[in-house]
């Protein structure tokens, strides 16, 4: 959770939650994948002074629970599979797979990278497999040594692969994310079970930190997903319907900005409704305020994968790099950006 998103969450009253429940890394450390040699250290201690808030690491489920605690569940209906939506004057009509229907004044479609609403509103081409595969697992920290729960974000890199570890939920869990290359892949989703032996085969001979983390993932808790490319959209809104988050700007994870960009969206959208006289006007202001920023993040994130996985690890030490800092991504403030 980078400062550009933390600013938005703090404006919603979640500053105490973040400071109490999220981990705040002091450094992001880049290592040689095989030798473990430290090649680059990025200081994150200065985020509060530079951006007014911190760089956080936290469990997504904990953030969702905090949002529910802050705002309540309202009249939320879970398990609904949207099949169609239409507009009629000042009403949005929704039809669900179970035969039920609903009406609303406005529809904000935060229905993910395989958004049904996006495909209804716009003629979007099919996603293209990037050639990259992501793997993930959560490890109980008690299964690992104390070096895994330090206030650090550790990334080990070799051409074609990298592996990141960092603690979440205090010192209770360690998140492990690995990225590899693949010739083809069909499924696009976060919940595809994988074999740990296959994951380990991609990291034979790697440093002890990486091998220890991967081997400690419970056998039944290894997941993988293919990473697919989509081009930025020219519009997000039509009438009283608009897209938000991955539905609007699905991006690869190489800048760590997917969730942060969605939080930016939500923060700005709330301001647009406060500013506008009609829902249509609010959504028009919203898309004008957000598309350029989100499209920039989407393009840079998508390009970042090719840069990272093609990189000689010593380039991190010996050559200028392009990352979140050089692109000044964290300086964006969704609370004050001009609408």
Regions found by a protein language model. Name each.
Residues 78, 90, 159-161, 223:
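Short beta-strand or tight-loop elements
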Residues 21-22, 75, 205-221, 279-284, ...:
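Acidic/histidine metal-binding catalytic segments
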Residues 108-109, 113, 135, 165, ...:
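Conserved mid-domain beta->alpha element of the FAD-binding
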Residues 16, 141-149, 171, 185, ...:
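Short helix-loop capping/hinge motifs at secondary-structure junctions, enriched
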Residues 321-339:
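C-terminal auxiliary extensions adjacent to catalytic cores
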Residues 31, 150-186, 192, 196-205, ...:
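Active-site substrate-recognition segment that forms the wall
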């Amino acid at each position: 959770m980078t400062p550009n998103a933390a600013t938005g969450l703090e404006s919603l009253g979640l500053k105490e939650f973040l400071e109490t429940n999220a981990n705040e890394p002091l450094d992001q450390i880049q290592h040689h994948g095989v030798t473990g040699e430290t090649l680059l250290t990025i200081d994150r201690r200065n985020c509060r002074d530079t951006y007014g808030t911190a760089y956080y690491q936290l469990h997504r489920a904990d953030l969702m629970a905090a949002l529910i605690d802050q705002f309540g569940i309202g009249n939320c209906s879970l398990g609904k599979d949207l099949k169609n939506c239409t507009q009629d004057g000042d009403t949005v009509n929704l039809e669900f797979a179970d035969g039920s229907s609903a009406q609303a004044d406005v529809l904000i479609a935060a229905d993910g990278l395989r958004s049904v609403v996006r495909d209804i509103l716009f003629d979007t081409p099919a996603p293209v497999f990037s050639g990259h595969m992501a793997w993930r697992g959560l490890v109980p920290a008690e299964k690992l040594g104390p070096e895994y729960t330090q206030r650090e974000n550790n990334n080990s890199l070799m051409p074609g692969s990298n592996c990141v570890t960092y603690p979440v939920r205090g010192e209770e869990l360690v998140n492990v994310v690995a990225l590899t290359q693949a010739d083809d892949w069909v499924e696009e989703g976060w919940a595809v079970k994988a074999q740990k032996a296959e994951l380990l085969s991609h990291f034979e001979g790697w440093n002890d930190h990486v091998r220890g983390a991967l081997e400690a993932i419970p056998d039944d808790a290894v997941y993988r997903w293919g990473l697919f490319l989509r081009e930025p959209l020219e519009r997000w809104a039509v009438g009283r319907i608009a897209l938000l988050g991955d539905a609007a700007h699905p991006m690869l994870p190489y800048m760590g900005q997917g969730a942060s960009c969605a939080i930016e969206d939500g923060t700005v959208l709330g301001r647009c409704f406060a500013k506008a006289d009609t829902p249509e006007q609010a959504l028009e202001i919203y898309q004008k305020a957000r598309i350029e920023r989100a499209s920039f993040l989407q393009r840079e994130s998508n390009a970042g994968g090719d840069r990272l996985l093609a990189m000689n690890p010593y380039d991190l030490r010996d050559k200028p790099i392009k990352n979140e800092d050089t692109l000044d991504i964290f300086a964006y403030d969704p609370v004050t950006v001009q609408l």
